[in-house]
Amino acid sequence: MHRPTIALFACVATLTPLSCGSDAPSAGGSSGGEAGRTIDVVASFYPLQYVVERVGGAHVSVENLTPSGAEPHELELTARDTAALSDADLVVYLRGFAPSVDDGVDDVADDHSVDVADAADLSLTYTPIEEGEQNTDEANTRDPHFWLDPTRLEAVATAVADRLGTIDPADAAEFTANAAALAADLQQLDGEYRTGLATCANTVIVTSHNAFGYLAQRYGMTQMGITGLTPEDEPSPGDLAAVTDFVNAHHVTTIYYETLVSPAIADTVAAETGAKTEVLDPIEGLSDTSQGADYFAVMRANLANLRVGQDCT
């Protein structure tokens, strides 16, 4: 049973180049190099889908393995999903985020896949500590939620552009230009966050799970998740009591919940402490309840909610 704790993070230098399969196309995929053709890409979950669509533009057709409204951490592949991985020209995924996707890539897509982990620089490790004792269940696990720091998506966009360019060299310059345009938009979003969160009465955020470590690090905040790196853990009554004590001790007035999982746990903590609840979306996927139609819209909705919840001026 996971015990909720303050998430402490250690920065680990990432020195290896982008981890991915060889540039050779899959047996089931297209041969590549044909100007004007559509590149079939499979992305494992929404932020990667968004990057591929922005970078590839009209030259790509992107399938998201995670259905709309589904939580991608525990995604289980169907036979159709496995066939899609095999037949794609390119699979873009994040190793360690969804184990079934890792297994599927290893089985049928190793030679036409790109793992974005190294480009994203997963430099935060999640180390839960409670009363001086380390919880070994998740100790030293890399935090995968890099896209909540918009600056980390820039390198991923460049990596995707490079890989698409090897498949379609005739349009490589366009992919590079699209990645640069996305990077400019991400830099603008980063500036909005830095300005919007520069002066807040409370810099401690309490979230339903520990998805916001990169955001917290980038913008000078401290995160505490009620559950660990995945939202499926069920906290015990003792766990909830520890969270309640933390909320009271740090004068937290807002408990943040997500759109893809039940808000029941956040509601329980809020009821015990007198705090209110508000959405803070980890953008692992979109649904009908998402506060925006794409990555940038949801990130800006998150910023607005943080400014209110943290009493920023």
Functional labels for PLM-detected ranges:
Residues 2-4, 20-313:
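Extracytoplasmic metal-acquisition and chelation regions
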